[in-house]
Amino acid sequence: MEEIKVHIGKTVALMNDNIDTDQIIPKSFLKRIERTGFGEFLFDSWRYLPNRKPNPDFPLNASDRQEATILITGDNFGCGSSREHAAWALLDYRFRVIIAGSYSDIFYMNCTKNGVLPIVLPKDAREKLAEIAADEDVTIDLPNQQVISSVGTYPFEIDATWKNKFINGLDDIAITFEHIDAIKAYEQKVDSI
């Protein structure tokens, strides 16, 4: 997993509440097992018109938002069916940070396990961040747990374990390898019984 200590990026806002995983990545695009190649289908039914041309009214299609790496959104983001592909699609599109009012528990875990930092902020903070100009950077300071912008600095909470994983770029396998000596000692002990 790629580490995130301080992320500086552009934003795009999609302020809908209850965006479910089928809206994030429709099930018709889940036929591959690789974690890449899903970004082009992110929010597919909203991003594209029936003729597959980009919907000019959809925020991600705005020419001045093409560099966005931070998605600002509503409450209950990632609800619906458990679908790890949704986190893969967000990351493959280039989002490293999602700022929402709340998340589905499973979706939150899928994000953290796949290198997408899910941040929870109240509605008033998200509404202010949503108004930031397209060419303006927002800073995510994970060690100090702050979202820093021209419209304000907003503290956020994150579990210490997840914070450590993001700051050090550790996934579950990397953490397991940190304990490899203890695992080998245990295996030798069990084998000797």
UniProtKB/Swiss-Prot annotation:
Keywords: Amino-acid biosynthesis, Branched-chain amino acid biosynthesis, Leucine biosynthesis, Lyase
Enzyme class, spelled out: lyase
Pfam families: Aconitase_C
UniProt superkingdom: Bacteria
CDD domains: IPMI_Swivel
GO biological process: L-leucine biosynthetic process
Bilayer-crossing regions: none
EC number per UniProt: 4.2.1.33
Record has Amino-acid biosynthesis as a keyword: yes
SS bonds (residue pairs): none
GO terms for MF: 3-isopropylmalate dehydratase activity
Protein's pathway: Amino-acid biosynthesis; L-leucine biosynthesis; L-leucine from 3-methyl-2-oxobutanoate: step 2/4
Gene Ontology CC terms, in alphabetical order: 3-isopropylmalate dehydratase complex
Catalysed reaction, written as an equation: (2R,3S)-3-isopropylmalate = (2S)-2-isopropylmalate
The keyword Lipid metabolism is assigned to this record: no
Family: Belongs to the LeuD family. LeuD type 1 subfamily.
PANTHER family according to UniProt: 3-ISOPROPYLMALATE DEHYDRATASE SMALL SUBUNIT (PTHR43345:SF5), 3-ISOPROPYLMALATE DEHYDRATASE SMALL SUBUNIT 2-RELATED-RELATED (PTHR43345)
Reported function: Catalyzes the isomerization between 2-isopropylmalate and 3-isopropylmalate, via the formation of 2-isopropylmaleate.
Subunit description: Heterodimer of LeuC and LeuD.
Matches recorded under NCBIfam families: leuD (TIGR00171), PRK01641.1 (NF002458)
Name the UniProt record assigns to this protein: 3-isopropylmalate dehydratase small subunit
